[in-house]
Amino acid sequence: LNPLKDTYDYDDLARDYLDMTVPSKGDLIGKQSFGDIFSEITMDLGQEASENGKEELNSGEQCLCYMAYTAWKSRERLTEKLKETGMEELFFSIEMPLIYSLFHMEQAGICVKREELQAYGERLRGQIETLEQEIYQGTGEVFNINSPKQLGEILFGKMELPYGKKTKTGYSTAADVLEKLAPEYPVVQKILDYRQLTKLKSTYADGLGAVIEADGRIHSTFNQTITATGRISSTEPNLQNIPVRMELGRLIRKVFVPEPGFVFLDADYSQIELRVLAHMSGDEKLIQAYREAEDIHRLTASQVFHIPLEEVTPLQRRNAKAVNFGIVYGISAFGLSEDLSITRKEALEYINRYFETYPEVKKFLDRLVEEGKEHGYVTTMFGRRRPVPELSSKNFMQRSFGERVAMNSPIQGTAADIIKIAMNRVDRRLRREGLKSRIVLQVHDELLIETWKEELDTVRTVLSEEMKHAADLKVS
């Protein structure tokens, strides 16, 4: 009902839906965790703590009572709001069953080879130390590379490199500034590499090692109410953001292994958001392109650049791919020019050609923006609402952001709804058939199944059937 919030404290529920003011969790227990509370709760309910014979609850017990009461009492009002907003079906058919799917996935966890993770960390440490020495030699000074202030003084003060932007706290050493310098100054590229490796080590080599539990598995928390578009997110740790763009990043995936007797089997929705765009826009040319072409990016390049399919170059395909995915996110000519390192005029020409090729897509995206302005929100195919308050802003940049949100949210949100439906169907089928195999990870459009080897063919069938029937799209 309010997807722009990422926390839903009981005192907020009481205020917003029950017209009540109650003490907050912070008021009652401060910074204590619920683990601390449970350990303190007195189990002797027969003990009388006051003269009138009634029990006196401690602050932890009061907090739990308020949580239970506000959840129970606000149910009727929240259900009414779901009906009023047309999201009752979404809530009861998708989100509520998903609680069980996510619980089963969190309970299963994913196995990690601790020794390989430690070896990976040692490898990173060695490379980081080597880079440190090379950076000291390249700059002619020993300093704290992790200090933006010291790094800025060395690069732009001492070495007098170009593009120095002085701020109140010193020179900016943001990635976009350093990336401009890297092609001409090898030491700057080493600094960028150093940053990547130190992040890999702290976040993954060290971070993952700290959360491996006694069963040898990592049990992440999967959240269904954090993102505004309805996407599932992962925290403690984030297993949806394992890097894949650099070789050392990809190596981290090798520490995740199936249990003995099991194998990993994954299935994803290929280009799900583009397929959703084709379906929701109803653009017949784009729908036909998906039905006929194995490579939608080559076909788009052929149509946008008006050349035969067999003559499409790798560069033209890459540019068409950037346009295809950029359109989904409401990309501007400036944004596309930055992505492809071309002029803004060329980028605008690419976008215009795309819309000339798929005119119903342009009409659909424009319609989404107009609906967002009129109603204050946009909706997914399944009725999920995404408020877009930025569309009414007096600030041009805010309004432009709002337009991109209005164009993208129904597409990304619909894709998120589809993968949730697929998760529910797959999880339910695996359990109904009494299989040992289980979902261990969901990464946006992909499901990873820890599959008992003897069930491999069965699980392949389950994934294929249940994911295909999650939604009825004009392009499958």
Q: Model segments located where?
A:
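Conserved catalytic core of nucleic-acid polymerases
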Residues: Q47-G53, Q107, H219-S220, Q224-T227, ...
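C-terminal structured "cap/appendage" subdomains that terminate the fold
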Residues: V426-S476
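Conserved "right-hand" nucleotidyltransferase catalytic core of DNA-directed polymerases
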Residues: K5, D9, L13, I29-R250, ...
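Conserved, non-catalytic sequence blocks in retroelement Pol enzymes and Pol-derived host proteins
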Residues: P3, I145, A267, A289-R291, ...
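Hydrophobic, well-ordered secondary-structure elements that form the walls
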Residues: S147, G230, D268, A301, ...
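Conserved beta-strand -> loop -> alpha-helix junction used to position metal-binding or nucleic-acid-contacting
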Residues: L1-P3, D9-D12, A293-H297
